Amino acid sequence: MGNQLQLLPENEEEEEDDMETEDRDGEDVEKPSIINFDTSLPTSHAYLGSDMEEFHGRTLHDEDSVQNLPVLPHVALILIPGQTLPLQLFRPQEVSMFRNLVSQDRTFAVLAHSPDPSGTETKAEFGTTAEIYAFREEQEYGIETVKIKAVGRQRFRVHDIRTQADGIRQAKVQILPERILPDPLCALQFLPRLHTHSPQTKHTQTTPPQKRCSQNYRQKKLHCASMTSWPPWVYSLYDSKTLMSRVKKQLHEWDENLKDESLPTNPTDFSYRVAACLPIDDALRLQLLKIGSAIQRLRCELDIMDRCTSLCCKQCQDTEITSKNEIFSLSLYGPMAAYVNPHGYVHETLTVYKASNLNLIGRPSTLHSWFPGYAWTIAQCRTCSSHMGWKFSAVKKDLSPPRFWGLTRSALLPTIPQGEEGVEGSRLLCL
């Protein structure tokens, strides 16, 4: 995928030829009722090549244990556990580091640098371990490169970072635990009887048996709150199944074609899946990464999804690019996933049906397309000319959707509506 700086015209005359203003911002773009694009293609990262060596099994370190891990350099990314990270590395130091890693436990550290208003890199206090599951080494024109697919595993806190004689940084980290909060109603003696048969209503007759059983169990369990000093709605705020149902409802508003079967059933894995696909800035994402409880993480994600209504250009902050109603999934990962371009830049890309206030740079290209069958065109903010992402256009007439936008998360800023008295909403939401 291209970078906007490499395709800028050299003079004003060429700029007039290459610059195209998106002049259909006001038109209503109908969402296609059927998406016939194979959503498994983006998850395979086929642009990296099909002959990669794959590894099986997974490496998990003991919670609270201290580990020494090599640090992934030159990649500014807050990795979420469970998130896929594709990489293309060219520097000899990096190639050597990962060549050694694949013969060991294949695990490295991805540091989560907190954002700094001045633009300088700050000291990272947290991060995520990543494990390589596919690897390919190649040589072209005398230059060695490695292509990697890795996945985030566990959160950690940074204790110390030291640079070795070969220039590779080693991080001493402590693996952070996942706190499983006990069910506050589990102590009630009659709770095991909640699976008893209940009469079916017209609604329950059309509900799948497994989902109906779960709903009945949850409703009856919360009904037991009448035996305590707190009302049921208080317990529902901290019930993992209730929170997951509320989040799924929001996700279905984003993507009508979303299937619940494609989502994790474990609250922890589910909360991480949602965190990885939320189009939020680094400040909010880092706050989510610090949370050690799936229930609290889900509560914060709900707050974010409820209150963030639109996405603006991060650079000029006043230019609205798209709204959450335009978000949809064109990948099994969800509406947003990480991809890497031929130059090694990793972009977390959000797919939306419609975007506004953008200019297109250059001509469409299918080279290294992250979505096979679509050509990409670089998109810039119309106000400040910041790189915002790409417009994807189908190269075949029968491909649906015929066009969409891929917006890079690093260029977006979620908009928090003002309060009743005109006061801007808190950027930290429920955190």
From Swiss-Prot:
Location of the protein in the cell: Cytoplasm; Nucleus
InterPro entries membership: CULT, Lon_prtase_N, Lon_prtase_N_sf, PUA-like_sf, Yippee/Mis18/Cereblon
BP-aspect Gene Ontology terms = cell population proliferation; embryonic pectoral fin morphogenesis; fin development; limb development; otic vesicle development; otic vesicle morphogenesis; proteasome-mediated ubiquitin-dependent protein catabolic process; protein ubiquitination
Positions that bind (S)-thalidomide: H368, W370, W376
Query: What keywords is this UniProt entry annotated with?
Result: Cytoplasm, Metal-binding, Nucleus, Ubl conjugation pathway, Zinc
Knockout mutant characteristics: Specific defects in fin and otic vesicle development.
CULT domain boundaries: 308-416
User: Lon N-terminal domain location, by residue?
Assistant: 69-309
Q: Note down the stretches annotated as region Disordered.
A: 1-36
Give the protein's recorded name: Protein cereblon
* Cross-referenced PROSITE patterns: CULT, LON_N
Miscellaneous note, as given in the UniProt record, is:
Thalidomide is teratogenic in human, chicken and zebrafish, but not in mice. Binding of thalidomide and related drugs changes the substrate specificity of the human DCX (DDB1-CUL4-X-box) E3 protein ligase complex, leading to decreased degradation of endogenous target proteins and increased degradation of other proteins that are not normal substrates. This is probably the underlying cause of the teratogenic activity of thalidomide, possibly due to abnormal regulation of the BMP and FGF8 signaling pathways.
Identify the species of origin.
Danio rerio
> Which pathway, metabolic or otherwise, does it act in?
Protein modification; protein ubiquitination
UniProt-recorded Gene Ontology molecular function terms:
metal ion binding
Subunit structure of this entry? Component of a DCX (DDB1-CUL4-X-box) protein ligase complex.
CDD domains according to UniProt? CRBN_C_like
Tell me the classification of the organism that encodes this protein.
Eukaryota, Metazoa, Chordata, Craniata, Vertebrata
